[in-house]
């Protein structure tokens, strides 16, 4: 099933948090890279891997998933985001995000907005960590997660491929 063939909402509904499935996808990715390495080595074709850059700051998660106990807290976050988020004091926004993340530490949307708060404070190191956590916990992983980037780095090293770290060049 291809996303372009489906209604957007239907496509998003098909994505659910499934750590087992995620590990299987990562294993398949590793195996695909290994097979590419064998074929390119046999054909004496050089390989250049490019670590993909991503827009951390201006691209929220495609899908976040709330779990049962955190539902009311997450609803408060959703209401706050829809009703004058930036008109609220930074301390209030941070407290709400901390409450959400305490209840649901893997809630990507809260991690993303926590990054926005860190940015607003000028704490760019913690902002980058929060934004990356939002990518890593995105239910619809259309951007490279840390584990995907690590797999690429490992294979570049293992098979002596050239590696371009595009994010570090930006």
Model-found features: residue ranges?
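Serine-dependent acyl-ester chemistry module
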Residues: 4-154, 158-159, 166-170
């Amino acid at each position: 099933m291809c996303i372009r063939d489906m209604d957007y909402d239907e496509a998003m509904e098909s994505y659910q948090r499934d750590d087992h499935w995620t590990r299987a996808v990562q294993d398949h990715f590793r195996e695909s890279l290994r097979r590419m390495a064998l074929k390119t080595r046999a054909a004496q074709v050089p390989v250049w891997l490019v670590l993909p850059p991503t827009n951390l700051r201006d691209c929220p998660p495609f899908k976040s998933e709330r779990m049962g106990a955190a539902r009311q807290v997450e609803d408060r976050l959703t209401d706050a985001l829809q009703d004058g988020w930036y008109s609220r004091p930074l301390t209030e926004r941070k407290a709400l995000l901390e409450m959400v993340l305490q209840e649901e530490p893997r809630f990507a949307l809260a991690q993303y907005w926590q990054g926005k708060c860190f940015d607003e404070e000028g704490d760019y190191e913690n902002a980058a960590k929060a934004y990356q956590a939002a990518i890593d916990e995105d239910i619809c992983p259309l951007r490279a997660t840390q584990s995907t980037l690590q797999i690429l780095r490992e294979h570049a090293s293992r098979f002596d491929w050239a590696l371009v770290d595009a994010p570090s060049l930006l």
